[in-house]
């Protein structure tokens, strides 16, 4: 061990250069040799080096098993004391690892848990652990080192500043502790026993429904949707909510109404009857409504007794049909699209007047088939008025009980009848047996015998048309 002490003395002069060291004392002119006094103490297990030198004042030293200590690990701890001497004394204590760990555990305290700054604080004689107050990410300790903590209060423990939300709750709680009164001028009603709604908004129940009140010198009205006082201009007369809130309320709850379709009477009649009238006009190839047009039959001849057809279109009225021979004039009211042969009268009840004689033809079914039975059967009216081609089939449709004068011969096989177009609306109409067929007859010779107009009898009864009279 003596050799170890000699080596230490030789190395200490090399390791330490007292002339080049900065001043440590209170004055920069002091000599560090006179100020600083180094003492080297080696602590071992029953081993005392016993060598003390003024030059062995410090250095880098790591103890090993050569010292006689069984552990191969040791550390250096430096403590700076401020005695009543003139200078500072640096004391090197070489202790075991266990003693060092105990001292460090007692002397250190963490200031911040975030790990950004850690400064060991040496507490020499303090054993009890520190109690910290953790608020969020920071921990506040008691002021141990005299104002070195991050935040502290005069009492030693830092107090966090209350948040605005907490302050608002405290304010509301203080207001609730006081007895609320109605804020309307002249009304000092205590609302402590009123409903929570009125206590919260500080308005009594009568004034919450009053049309006009005075609040802070202004005319106001309480809105039950906004729960506030508004100006009178924002309200309707009898509504308890302001106009803006009512509009929003109705827009959320009411569905948009479909646009109403308004039709005048003239427009409605045009929609209902316009198509039927146009179809009747197309059926006979006539001019527009209210005009007259004439068309000669295909057997036009200079004979005075020939037929001459005039097509007319008149408003819907009580239908009649007329037929004439030898130019006898007939005045007649007829439905749209009727063919008016200038001749004898034939009323709706079956009377037909001829030039030579008056024959009563009881064939109302045929007449009704030639006219419209109503607005619903307007297209069927054209079915009855069409002049179909009369051939052998048409001649076979003659009733066997018909009365034909011997001097009258059917001209179906000798003359070409008037042909009318068959529109597409006939597709869903009556059959050929039920359709109206006009068969025109001409006189043979110049005798004065009676002429008869043969009208085929329809296959349906006349009860429907009798009701129209």
From Swiss-Prot:
GO CC terms: nucleus
Protein name: Squamosa promoter-binding-like protein 3
Primary location class: nucleus
Placement of sequence motif Bipartite nuclear localization signal: 239-255
Domain text: The SBP-type zinc finger is required for the binding to DNA.
Positions that bind Zn(2+) 2: 223, 226, 230, 242
Keyword line: DNA-binding, Metal-binding, Nucleus, Transcription, Transcription regulation, Zinc, Zinc-finger
Entry comment describing in which tissues the protein is expressed: Ubiquitous.
A Pfam family that the UniProt record links to this protein: SBP
Entry function: Trans-acting factor that binds specifically to the consensus nucleotide sequence 5'-TNCGTACAA-3'. May be involved in panicle development.
SUPFAM superfamilies listed in its UniProt record: SBT domain
PANTHER family hit by this protein: SQUAMOSA PROMOTER-BINDING-LIKE PROTEIN 2, SQUAMOSA PROMOTER-BINDING-LIKE PROTEIN 4
Residues holding Zn(2+) 1: 182, 187, 204, 207
Zn-finger (SBP-type) residues: 179-256
Organism encoding this protein: Oryza sativa subsp. indica (Rice)
